[in-house]
């Protein structure tokens, strides 16, 4: 595995976990359900969903080197309109990639909706860039 790919995966996982932490905190403070059924918003379920999405996206990026390079370059840019424009241009030129990544992130989107977690794609990119900037 290339060092850049491993680093990108670690950053993506760190960002996804950071995005899920507020929801995990809420889930931990929430009262258990009366039925005793597994809580889909419990911290353990949030972590499983985040991990699953991160693994799927990492595998996808490994198998799509051009998209991996674009995403890596975006992580190295300053947070702002330029980085969003770079991604938008890539996705407009490659609608299948946009559709694939949307489908891969759908479990996280569903979790966000179901558990009222404020997670969006742009927030994830911004946090990934912030992590990248903090490590320089």
Swiss-Prot record:
<comment type="subunit">
    <text>Dimer of dimers.</text>
</comment>
<feature type="binding site">
    <location>
        <position position="90"/>
    </location>
    <ligand>
        <name>heme</name>
    </ligand>
</feature>
<feature type="disulfide bond">
    <location>
        <begin position="41"/>
        <end position="115"/>
    </location>
</feature>
<keyword id="KW-0964">Secreted</keyword>
<dbReference type="InterPro" id="IPR030937">
    <property type="entry name" value="Hemophore_Rv0203"/>
</dbReference>
<dbReference type="GO" id="GO:0005576">
    <property type="term" value="C:extracellular region"/>
</dbReference>
<feature type="signal peptide">
    <location>
        <begin position="1"/>
        <end position="27"/>
    </location>
</feature>
<dbReference type="Pfam" id="PF16525">
    <property type="entry name" value="MHB"/>
</dbReference>
<dbReference type="InterPro" id="IPR038378">
    <property type="entry name" value="MHB_sf"/>
</dbReference>
<keyword id="KW-0732">Signal</keyword>
<keyword id="KW-0349">Heme</keyword>
<feature type="binding site">
    <location>
        <position position="64"/>
    </location>
    <ligand>
        <name>heme</name>
    </ligand>
</feature>
<dbReference type="InterPro" id="IPR032407">
    <property type="entry name" value="MHB"/>
</dbReference>
<keyword id="KW-1015">Disulfide bond</keyword>
<keyword id="KW-0479">Metal-binding</keyword>
<protein>
    <recommendedName>
        <fullName>Heme-binding protein Rv0203</fullName>
    </recommendedName>
</protein>
<dbReference type="GO" id="GO:0020037">
    <property type="term" value="F:heme binding"/>
</dbReference>
<feature type="binding site" description="axial binding residue">
    <location>
        <position position="60"/>
    </location>
    <ligand>
        <name>heme</name>
    </ligand>
</feature>
<keyword id="KW-0408">Iron</keyword>
<dbReference type="GO" id="GO:0015886">
    <property type="term" value="P:heme transport"/>
</dbReference>
<comment type="function">
    <text>Part of a heme-iron acquisition system. Acts by binding heme and delivering it to the membrane proteins MmpL3 and MmpL11. Can use free heme or heme from host hemoglobin.</text>
</comment>
<dbReference type="GO" id="GO:0046872">
    <property type="term" value="F:metal ion binding"/>
</dbReference>
């Amino acid at each position: 595995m290339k060092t850049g790919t491993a680093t990108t995966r670690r950053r993506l996982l760190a960002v996804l976990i950071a995005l899920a932490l507020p929801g995990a905190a809420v889930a931990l403070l929430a009262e258990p359900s009366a039925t005793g059924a597994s809580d889909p918003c419990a911290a353990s379920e949030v972590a499983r969903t985040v991990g699953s999405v991160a693994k799927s996206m990492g595998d996808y990026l490994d198998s799509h080197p051009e998209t991996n390079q674009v995403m890596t370059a975006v992580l190295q840019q300053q947070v702002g309109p330029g980085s969003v424009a770079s991604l938008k241009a890539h996705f407009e030129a490659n609608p299948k990639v946009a559709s694939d990544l949307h489908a891969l992130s759908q479990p996280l989107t569903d979790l966000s909706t179901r558990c009222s977690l404020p997670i969006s794609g742009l927030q994830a990119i911004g946090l990934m860039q912030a992590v990248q900037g903090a490590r320089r």
